[in-house]
Amino acid sequence: MALSTYTDIETAVIAWLNRVGASDIAANTHDFIELSQRRLQREVRVPPMETLVEGLTITAGSASIPTDMLDVKEVIAYDGSVAWDVYRTTYTKVKAARLSGLCGPTHFDTVAGNLLFGPEPSAGVSVDLVYYKEIEFISTLVPQNWFSQYAPETILYGALVEASVFMKDTEQEQKYEQKFKEAIQALKDQKQKAEHAGRLQIHTN
């Protein structure tokens, strides 16, 4: 059975559940698939989710967090001759770095919807951000995304977990939860191999 589109996965969820005697939950399949994808967004970080923003707009040591950002992967600063890592730390340490009067930035933290840098970027210093972005969910209006094309089993097993919870079927929930975790781990292993091989897919805004 093909599993590359929303309709494919929706059909598979219904078919798999029918095999265990659940023929009356088709109307809720959309919810199960959406909940599965929300869980994926929380638990998985894969190269196709990476986006590079070059030359962040920073005012008074602060930059707005991109609206689609899930998590920061890497921040670097550079001045035309050298580049260096900007490390994530606590707000206390960022504040202390700001008060130090040294050249920067060397550290950052996320606070109230902003990236705060310490010390504030020195004159002539630019900052690049690599972050993990949300991948648009598959739905009746969006038939495919990266997960449905390359890891559809993650969406399917996650949806079956949610459906099993809905049906109060603990045995099925445990079975599909194990399959979901195995599929997630396979993705993480694949990412690790790709990073060691130096083949990352980064999209530039």
Regions found by a protein language model. Name each.
Residues M1-N205:
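Glycine-enriched, solvent-exposed interface loops adjoining structured elements
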